[in-house]
Amino acid sequence: MFFFEVELFDAHVLISKIIKSANQSIFLFDNYIDETVLTQLSKKNKGVTVKIYIKNISRQLQLDVEKFNTQYGSLQVIEFGKSHDRFLIIDQTAIYHLGASLKDLGKKWFAFSKLLIDPALILGKLDS
């Protein structure tokens, strides 16, 4: 899908639907996380675990995550510097490539694609 800068709400709705579709897990690779992304992730179903992989975990982000977990639970941030692009993996079965950070969706033109690869290809590299 392709979104123009005026399609902020449409981009937000699409991401919300994808987040709500998760029944078990969400993996997010995005180096530009802030509280707006946590707000989007608060729409997850109860019991869904979230792991965010980010290059640097700021003190502010850590505080925001602690508050998120107090109310919604099951969110973990992990320092990870190997990814330049942004990816969203749902239930270890679907993987999306994001042309923009979740916090910036709809601010400028960007593309959003579902990849036809097995998410295990990426998830299997996390422990190595």
Predicted regions and their residues:
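PLD/PLD-like phosphodiesterase catalytic module centered on the HKD motif
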Residues: M1-H12, S21, F27-S128
